[in-house]
Regions:
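Compositionally biased terminal segments of proteins
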Residues: 1-242
Length: 242
């Protein structure tokens, strides 16, 4: 479920997959399950961020308002012509080395590559512990309704982040509806999270299947980067914009 400005921007983001960029976060989840409007695009890549190549492939980013510009983080606000409302935030994060536990998927329109539902749940469970925002709880509840098991998501997060993620801590946080704007979380989502936590079973062992976030050989060709191999070992803290 994308707002009109985001939908209008989608074709301009087409080169992202060929650059090896994989969509994570709320927008990736919304594209799968359509549960809420998410207004940001958060792209991850395991390689160092090649800014010059990024801007060459998507020159509209170069004329956007820069919100953050660091070696492995580039965030801009894009004003979409003829669409009133706030700009669309596009973020690209490099050197994301936690890997993936599922197979990335291509969106129905063939434009973008997104993380698997299991990877999306695993990363959401981790970022939920770093901030108190209702949208994270909404995203997790939507994935549970869509059939992703909480236990599998906890196992995925443990595989991706190692000792930096403790399943019991996440289970407690899932039913602690205080802090930030979590108070506005709807009752249906609260009830679902409480029931799911209460009935949670053993957390399975989940393995990291690849250090490459994208899917070489998928429907969209992924071009190689020239910035060297990814740094071994996982990043224990995902970028918060997820």
């Amino acid at each position: 479920m994308l707002p009109p400005a985001q939908r209008a921007l989608l074709p301009l983001l087409g080169p992202a997959a060929a650059l090896g960029l994989t969509l994570y976060g709320g927008t990736a989840i919304a594209l799968h399950v359509g549960h809420r409007q998410s207004v940001d695009f958060d792209f991850f890549i395991e390689r160092a961020l090649d800014r010059s190549r990024l801007l060459k492939a998507m020159p509209f980013l170069g004329s956007a308002l820069v919100l953050q510009d660091e070696p492995d983080t580039f965030t801009v606000a894009v004003v979409v012509d003829d669409y009133p409302g706030p700009p669309v935030k596009v973020s690209v994060f490099g050197s994301i080395t936690f890997g993936r536990v599922g197979e990335p998927e291509v969106t129905d329109d063939g434009l973008l590559v997104t993380a698997s539902l299991l990877d999306l749940l695993g990363t959401k469970l981790k970022v939920m512990l770093q901030r108190a925002e209702a949208k994270d709880y909404q995203d997790i509840a939507a994935l549970l309704r869509h059939g992703v098991r909480l236990e599998d998501g906890l196992g995925a997060a443990r595989a991706l982040y190692g000792k930096a993620f403790q399943p019991q801590e996440a289970l407690r946080a899932l039913t602690y509806f205080e802090g930030g704007d979590v108070a506005r979380l709807g009752q249906a989502d609260r009830d679902l999270l409480a029931r799911t936590v209460a009935s949670a079973g053993m957390v399975p062992e989940v393995v990291v299947r690849s250090g490459t976030l994208g899917a070489p050989g998928a429907a969209l060709p992924l071009a190689p980067f020239d910035s060297g191999p990814p740094t071994p070992g996982g990043d224990p803290h995902p970028p918060e914009p997820i």
